[in-house]
């Protein structure tokens, strides 16, 4: 049985609910992978039988905790993200089996380096150009991540698993687009 963080009672009801939902999932044998940035191929996480959870900074609340480890002039998004990890106040980070990030900026690279001391953190190398070499590099990164998931969870991810996950994520994207289209209505 997993424990809740020591500071659980000080959380808002919404944050407590998030913790309880994640704890229930983990207590039932569920797998959770925390992700930073939309470049992480969540389809592979789903194909591995895990739930991808988006991690980010939702408030300035934990920035002061992060500034004990990061420069104060660093991006507030990075400081808040790292602060949530340090303070055990994000249910999705707390219950993630491991974290996946990417190299969109130097600040995130440093954050992931430090974050690896808190929880295993896998960093995907994001190409910085849009040519054939970059595409080849990204394809290799995706295959390395595929292998990481298989090794970490002791599973085999098949092409069929990936195809099913792609269909699921595409259906989700279509629904989000439909929702956003509602904003055009009078």
Roles of regions detected by a PLM:
Residues 1-186:
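An N-terminal assembly and electron-transfer interface module characteristic of large anaerobic redox
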């Amino acid at each position: 049985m997993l424990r809740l963080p020591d500071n659980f009672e000080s959380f808002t009801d919404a944050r407590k609910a998030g913790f309880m939902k994640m704890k229930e999932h983990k207590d039932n044998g569920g797998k959770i992978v925390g992700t930073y940035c939309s470049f992480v191929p969540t389809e592979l996480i789903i194909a591995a039988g895990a739930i991808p959870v988006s991690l980010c900074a939702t408030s300035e609340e934990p920035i002061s905790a992060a500034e004990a480890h990061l420069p104060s002039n660093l991006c507030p998004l990075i400081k808040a993200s790292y602060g949530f990890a340090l303070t055990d106040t994000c249910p999705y980070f707390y219950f993630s089996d491991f974290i996946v990030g990417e190299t969109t900026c130097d600040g995130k690279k440093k954050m992931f380096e430090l974050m690896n001391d808190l929880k295993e953190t896998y960093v995907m190398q994001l190409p910085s150009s849009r040519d054939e070499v970059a595409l080849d590099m990204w394809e290799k990164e995706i295959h390395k991540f595929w292998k990481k998931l298989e090794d970490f969870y002791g599973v085999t991810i098949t092409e069929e698993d990936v195809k099913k996950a792609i269909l699921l994520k595409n259906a989700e994207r279509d629904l989000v687009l439909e929702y956003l289209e509602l904003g055009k209505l009078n």
